[in-house]
Every structure is written in C-alpha cells, then in structure tokens.
UniProtKB/Swiss-Prot annotation:
GO terms for molecular function: electron transporter, transferring electrons within cytochrome b6/f complex of photosystem II activity; electron transporter, transferring electrons within the cyclic electron transport pathway of photosynthesis activity; ubiquinol-cytochrome-c reductase activity. This is Cytochrome b6-f complex subunit 4. Belongs to the cytochrome b family. PetD subfamily. GO terms for biological process: photosynthetic electron transport chain. It holds the Pfam family Cytochrom_B_C. The gene is petD.
Length: 160
C-alpha cells in the first residue's frame, strides 16, 4: 500500500504542490468513494460471514432444561463473582463478610495517598503499589479457585 500511494515526484506540478504543503490532498487513492463504498462493506460482510460460519460449524449446545424440583447441592454464581462468594461463604459472620468487601475499594483509594512521595511512573519503581496490586491479584485468584471447590476443601484448595 505504501508503494501505491507514493507521489510521483517527477511531475513538476506535483512537486510544486508538495513544496507548498498541499500534497496530501492531491496524490494517492481517495477515501471517498474507494474506502467507504468498497473496502468497508467487504470487511463488514467478511466479519459477518466469519461469525455466521463459526456459528454454523460449531453451534453452542443448549444445556439440560431447568428442573425446579431438582435443586443442585450448591448453587454457584457466575465465575466473576467467585471471590466475593468465597468471602461470604467462609466468613462466619455475614456482617463481617460485607465489611471485608468494603475494605477492597477503601484500600484501592488509599494507595495514591500511601505512595504520594513516589514520582515514578514505572511500576517496578513503585514498590508499594506493586505489592498491593500483586497481593490483591493473588488473593483474588486464591478466593476464586477456592469458591469452585467444596466448602471443606475451599481454604486449602484441596492440597492438604
């Protein structure tokens, strides 16, 4: 594409326009109608064809029908709510579980004030922020894995 859109510098009129700074409008392939009428529909229709083709070749199978009289032993939330579910499931006092969940946003709001002395943007030169981030990430992963396990194995992740 770069070679096709290069201006012809042997043309004296083009060189004069380029010298005046007017060259970007006078050479190459115009956006209207070429891009908007020909290339964009091809890309859009190609994307739709890929999605429809994948849906036809590998359809998502429907699960069993819901049976209101056969409740599972433990109802799990969606995967992104596993850490919160694990906190509420493990902590004996539910009010304490809610209080622990409010500590997460409060802790995140305190990080800029704790590390206000550090002027670096590089994460490796900000040890407090990196420690808070890595600890929070590891605790979230730990709680998420534990929520998928039965309650008796959830704290040890079934390792002990």
């Amino acid at each position: 594409m770069h070679i096709l859109k290069k201006p012809d510098l042997s043309d004296p009129k083009m060189r004069a326009k380029l010298a005046k700074g007017m060259g970007h409008n006078y050479y190459g392939e115009p956006a209207w109608p070429n891009d908007l009428l020909y290339i964009f529909p091809v890309v859009i229709l190609g994307t739709i064809a890929c999605v429809v083709g994948l849906a036809v070749l590998d359809p998502a199978m429907l699960a069993d029908k819901a049976d209101p009289f056969a409740t599972p032993l433990e109802i799990l939330p969606e995967w992104y709510l596993y850490p919160v579910f694990q906190i509420l499931r493990v902590v004996p006092n539910k009010l304490l579980g809610i209080a622990l969940q409010t500590l997460v946003p409060l802790g995140l709001m305190l990080v800029p004030f704790i590390e206000s002395f550090n002027k670096f943007q590089n994460p490796f030169r900000r040890p407090v922020a990196m420690t808070v981030f890595l600890t929070g990430t590891l605790v979230t992963i730990y709680l998420g894995i534990g929520a998928a396990l039965p309650i008796d194995k959830s704290l040890t992740l079934g390792l002990f």
